[in-house]
C-alpha cells in the first residue's frame, strides 16, 4: 500500500479556503501577480507564514524541523556558482541537502541523466546555456528523492524536445509524491497534471481534474472563421488564432448565446472561463 502524504493550506496569502494536497501532480495556473510564487515560497518556508496555516501530515510545518528535507524546489529564477563545474555545483547542493558522499554522487549522476545533461557534467556553469541551467535546476530539485516537488515555471526557456522530456520525468517519478507545478504553459498542465488549480488575487478560485476544468467551458467554446468575427456576440475572449488550409480562425470563449455551434473545450478554455468568471 502506498504511503499517502498530504499537506493542508489555509489563509496563506490574502484568503485561502482550506485546500489539501495528497499524492498526485497539481498544475497551478494564474496570471502574473496572482500569488503563485508567493504560495510556493510559503510552502517551502522561504516566507514566514504567521500562525499555524501550513500542515504536513497533520503537523504545522513551522514546528517540524525535518520538513525542508521532504521538499525539492525549483524557483522561478535559479542560479549557480559560475566558477564551478555542473557536477561540482550539484554535489554541493546534494551535500547541503544532507546526502552522504556516495548518495550524492549517485543522485547527481541519475539526475543529470534524467535531464539529458550527463555530457555537460564537467562543463563550467558559466559555459551553460540558459536552457541547460534550467534543466540543471530541475535536476537539483530531484536530489535526495524528496516527497514534495515544487516547480515554479520549470519549462520556461526550454525547447519543445526538452519540455517533452520534463513531462516524461514527471510521469516517471510521480508515484507516492506530491508535485506542484506553476506554469503559464497550459499544454504542460494538460500533459502531466491530474488536478488543476486557478489562482487570482491570492486566492484559489477554481480547482478540479483536467476534465472538470475543461467542463467549465462546456457550451462556451467556439471556433469561427476570422471573417465571421463581426457576427459573434460580445462579450467574448479570444483564446488563440490559427490558420488552416490558407484560412484564419479564432478560438473564442463566451457565455453569450451565439449563432455558432460550440466545440469540445479543453483545459485552457476552462482556465479562461474560470479566470474571467464566465
For each predicted feature, which ranges?
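Conserved ABC ATPase signature
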Residues: 124-128
Amino acid at each position: 500500500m502506498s504511503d499517502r502524504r498530504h499537506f493542508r493550506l489555509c489563509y496563506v496569502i490574502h484568503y485561502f479556503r482550506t485546500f489539501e494536497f495528497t499524492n498526485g501532480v497539481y498544475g497551478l495556473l494564474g496570471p502574473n501577480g496572482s500569488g503563485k510564487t508567493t504560495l510556493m515560497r510559503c510552502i517551502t518556508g522561504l516566507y514566514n507564514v504567521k500562525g499555524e496555516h501550513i500542515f504536513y501530515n497533520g503537523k504545522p510545518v513551522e514546528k517540524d524541523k525535518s520538513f525542508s528535507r521532504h521538499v525539492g524546489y525549483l524557483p522561478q529564477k535559479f542560479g549557480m556558482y559560475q566558477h564551478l563545474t555542473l557536477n561540482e555545483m550539484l554535489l554541493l547542493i546534494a551535500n547541503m541537502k544532507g546526502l552522504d558522499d556516495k548518495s550524492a554522487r549517485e543522485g547527481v549522476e541519475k539526475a543529470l541523466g534524467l535531464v539529458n545533461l550527463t555530457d555537460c557534467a564537467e562543463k563550467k556553469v558559466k559555459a551553460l546555456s540558459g536552457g541547460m541551467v534550467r534543466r540543471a535546476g530541475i535536476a537539483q530539485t530531484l536530489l535526495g528523492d524528496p516527497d514534495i516537488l515544487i516547480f515554479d515555471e520549470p519549462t520556461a526557456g526550454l525547447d519543445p524536445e526538452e519540455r517533452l522530456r520534463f513531462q516524461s520525468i514527471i510521469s516517471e517519478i510521480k508515484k507516492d509524491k506530491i508535485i506542484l507545478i506553476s506554469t503559464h504553459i497550459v499544454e504542460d498542465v494538460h500533459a502531466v497534471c491530474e488536478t488543476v488549480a486557478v489562482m487570482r488575487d491570492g486566492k484559489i478560485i477554481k480547482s478540479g481534474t483536467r476534465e472538470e476544468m475543461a467542463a467549465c467551458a462546456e457550451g462556451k467554446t467556439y471556433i469561427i472563421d476570422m471573417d465571421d468575427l463581426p457576427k459573434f456576440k460580445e462579450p467574448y475572449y479570444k483564446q488563440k488564432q490559427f490558420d488552416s488550409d490558407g484560412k484564419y480562425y479564432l478560438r473564442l470563449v463566451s457565455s453569450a448565446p451565439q449563432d455558432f455551434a460550440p466545440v469540445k473545450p479543453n483545459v485552457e478554455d476552462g482556465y479562461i472561463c474560470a479566470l474571467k468568471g464566465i
